[in-house]
Curated annotation (Swiss-Prot):
Coiled-coil stretches noted in the UniProt entry, renumbered to this chain: none
PROSITE patterns: RBFA
UniProt keywords, alphabetically: Cytoplasm, Ribosome biogenesis
Protein's name in the database: Ribosome-binding factor A
Gene Ontology process terms (BP): maturation of SSU-rRNA
Function: One of several proteins that assist in the late maturation steps of the functional core of the 30S ribosomal subunit. Associates with free 30S ribosomal subunits (but not with 30S subunits that are part of 70S ribosomes or polysomes). Required for efficient processing of 16S rRNA. May interact with the 5'-terminal helix region of 16S rRNA.
One matching Pfam family: RBFA
InterPro entries, per the entry: KH_dom-like_a/b, RbfA, RbfA_dom_sf, Ribosome-bd_factorA_CS
Subcellular location: Cytoplasm
Protein family: Belongs to the RbfA family.
GO CC annotations on file: cytosol
Length: 141
């Protein structure tokens, strides 16, 4: 009798992490070599930040961000239009039983990190942080 894996919030398995990194590495090479005719992709330098494969490795969420300035949502939409082409190229480069179906998503983690830095550098927040550090130093003495 086959065991069924129950859905837990442990995170991705070692197999998923390894497959995701394999797909990410291959996609970076493919995107760097190929010329795209899509207007949203012309002249864009693309960073593939993360690939999250499904547990059965048949579907992969690919997170992308433009290098420099650019619209992440337009970039993801353009890559989704080219997903079948990219999947075909990916299948020729990697050795997996199934080539995963690619779903591109905008990676906003850089924007979020920049926003948090801006918040922490505001004068009112900096004053509060300095006051907190000063009171901690007094407590240690």
């Amino acid at each position: 009798m086959a065991r069924r894996q129950t859905h837990t919030s442990k995170g991705p398995s070692q197999r998923q992490l390894r497959a995701g990194e394999l797909v990410r590495h291959a996609l970076v090479g493919i995107i760097a070599r190929e010329e795209f005719r899509d207007p949203d992709l012309e002249g864009q330098m693309i960073s593939v930040t993360e690939v999250r494969p499904s547990p059965d490795l048949r579907v992969a969420k690919v997170y992308v961000a433009p290098l420099g300035r650019g619209d992440s949502a337009k970039l993801a939409a353009g890559l989704n239009r080219c997903a079948a082409f990219l999947r075909g190229r990916l299948g020729r480069e990697i050795e997996m039983k199934f080539t995963p179906e690619l779903h591109f998503h905008a990676d906003n983690s850089f924007d979020t990190a920049s926003h948090v830095d801006d918040l922490l550098n505001r004068p009112t927040v900096r004053k509060d942080l300095d006051a907190t550090r000063g009171s901690e130093a007094d407590a240690e003495d």
